[in-house]
Design a protein with these regions (language model features):
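Conserved beta-hairpin
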Residues: 49-62, 67
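Conserved GNAT-fold acetyl-CoA-binding loop/helix
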Residues: 25-41
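Short loop/turn motifs at secondary-structure junctions and domain boundaries
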Residues: 42-48
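Conserved beta-strand-loop-alpha-helix junction that forms the acyl-donor binding cleft
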Residues: 102-121, 137-138
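A short beta-loop-alpha structural element at the N-terminal edge
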Residues: 2-19
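Conserved catalytic-core motifs of GNAT/GCN5-like acyltransferases
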Residues: 130-138
Length: 138
């Protein structure tokens, strides 16, 4: 069973989130690893609607968050179908997406995944989740 710890944030959580960041295999939002101080400032701003550290059997499994555009970030050390199902279910059971705003925000939760994260992409395909978008830098 997975346990979700809401990011407050405190020193322990900032360290664990930095550990996850330094070991992340794929990234969407940054090219270079921030310093611990930069990371600490970012986390302290509490930039997401909600952010959780995820534990399984008292071991840090990853993190998940919801942004103001209803996107859900999922960062797992070793993604697997069962954990993704449990995380998705927890998000949907405990949170409602923000109302849609035409041309700005969908009325549903959605997950952005790095195109290099083949494991997570395959998990969502096996779960018959609909792909709605591909993004390109210009």
């Amino acid at each position: 069973m997975i346990n979700f710890e809401k990011v407050i944030p405190n020193k322990k959580q900032i360290k664990e989130l930095y550990h996850l960041l330094t070991n992340r295999r794929y990234s969407i939002s940054h090219q270079n690893l921030p310093s611990f101080e930069e990371h600490s400032k970012f986390v302290s701003k509490n930039p997401y609607l909600v952010w959780y550290l995820i534990y399984k059997n008292f071991e840090l499994l990853g993190s998940t968050y919801i942004q103001k555009d209803n996107s859900v970030g999922i960062d797992l050390k070793l993604p697997n179908k069962e954990d993704v199902i449990e995380i998705s279910s927890y998000i949907k059971k405990n949170h409602l997406p923000l109302k849609p705003v035409k041309s700005l925000r969908r009325g549903d939760f959605f997950v952005n995944i790095s195109p290099f994260d083949k494991e997570l992409i395959e998990i969502f395909k096996k779960l018959n989740q609909k792909e709605i978008q591909r993004s390109f830098l210009i």
